[in-house]
Amino acid sequence: MRRPPGDGDSTGEGPGNWGLWGAQESRRLCCVGPDRCGQALLQIGINMMALPGGRHLDSVPLQEQRLHFMQVDSVQRWMEDLKLMTECECMCVLQAKPISLEEDTQGDLILAGGPGPGDPLQLLLKRGWVISTELRRIGQKLAQDRWARVHSMSVRLTCHARSMVSEYSTISRTASQEMGQAEKLLMEKCSELSAVTERCLQVENEHVLKSMKACVSETLSLLGEHFGQLLELALTREVQALVRKIDTSDNIYITESTTGNLFGLTQEGAPLCRIIAKEGGVVALFKVCRQDSFRCLYPQALRTLASICCVEEGVHQLEKVDGILCLADILTDESHSEATRAEAAAVVAQVTSPHLSFTQHLTSFLENMEEIVTALIKLCQEASSGEVFLLASAALANITFFDKMACEMLLQLNAIRVLLEACGDKQRVDTPYTRDQIVTILANMSVLEQCGSDIIQENGVQLIMGMLSEKPRSGTPAEVAACERVQQKAAVTLARLCRDPDVAQEAVRLSCMSRLIELCRSPSERNSSDAVLVACLAALRRLAGVCPEGLQDSDFQQLVQPRLVDSFLLCSNMEESFV
């Protein structure tokens, strides 16, 4: 199931998502040394991704008649076994795992299954990953004063850098003076690092070695800066070529292939998205979305735009080319396929994300908000799959944070009825991620006084009560977190709605107080979430003000009467009884 863009969930990057050298708070590399060294490595950090390598060889069982070899030298036994082996991967394994007395859990890095001929982007990404990983590991070994390892890794780093420069020069289109200068500076620093680490091997005086360590850190820092500059220059040139091809091509197959390549680059992280935005990627993609001859490419182009707009530069470019107006036109034009409108909803969800501060000043969005909200409600109502509903509801949820007028529009458009009806349709609402979007909309709409009567009319209190019992099916961290958000927002919605006495009486009739007490007292019911606990305590206190007779004395004295912080501390320290 696709996750909504701009949803704010913190998910770990999968093995297919490895970013670039940009300074990202959540992707800092572990490098110990002077500040400049750490900063340089931070600037070139690439997320770890296991490159496809050789598979582990299964151990070959020994026959009983060969048990005597167990007492023989291990090398001799290996030589005997080698006669019977026909595995073609043995040499690969030997190359990847050098014989060494030094324990190193990661071993040496090799490029397995390297980029094909004429594929400069993959070459840059793979070589870039290897080099930045080597830089990080050199920093770690330097902090441990493992000088022999630092020197050997520095030599290997020089080889990787030379290979990247040589291979890219072979397949790149044209050479530039700026690129040549960056390559020269990088190789000079690589040679300097190898030379200074070699001298360190011959020094025994600790005081001299300590001063030389600072010199190595400085060199490593500068090397990282030069590598980052070279990689950015090379990637910028390749992105320019892709954008130019999209912008000038009138061939649907070339445009489709190039747009797909651009989308692949957006999955490599925010730094590449910034490069794409700066080099006109947003402008070129909206040009595709405005040509009827490319209608079949709209979903792919919009999906790429949603990825680019995770960075500030992408959103600014979108506003410059009247992207919001284009999205509104696509969403309101029913001649477009459902897939196209769903991808347009994904872009809207991204650019209205409440977690991105730079999206809060889109004046063009306010001008088109009514049309967009109306189209999104209709898309939710007519969605043929859970993914389409998820994208449309995620956009609506983010819009309710974006502007207060959106909640009033949703109320007038009978959004509560549409959303609550969808909750009973397993084809549209089948995951906690989707219910998270629905309850977010309800929580934000519940600040309106008129909302309570609509909720009761559509049997909404019972559905909200059901959300208080949301449980993960798979147990994955992302799904567990989504369930916690559903429980928390359901409790918040209930607390807000219970200002209306009719809603409060309905909640008491449906035994909401019992469920709230259970969530407060039983950590496992709320996955030990403090956010859920606070929301449930607030909702329980609101209900107790309307119907105090629904509480036992012990519950009232522990959960309602004390200050909220005291009740919170009491419940958060509770140990469950398994008797």
Swiss-Prot record:
It is found in: Cytoplasm; Cytoplasm, Cell cortex. GO terms for biological process: asymmetric cell division; cell differentiation; nervous system development. The keyword Transport does not apply. SUPFAM superfamilies: ARM repeat. Expressed in brain, kidney, liver, testis and skin. It comes from the Eukaryota. The keyword Iron-sulfur does not apply. This is Protein inscuteable homolog. The lineage of its organism: Eukaryota, Metazoa, Chordata, Craniata, Vertebrata.
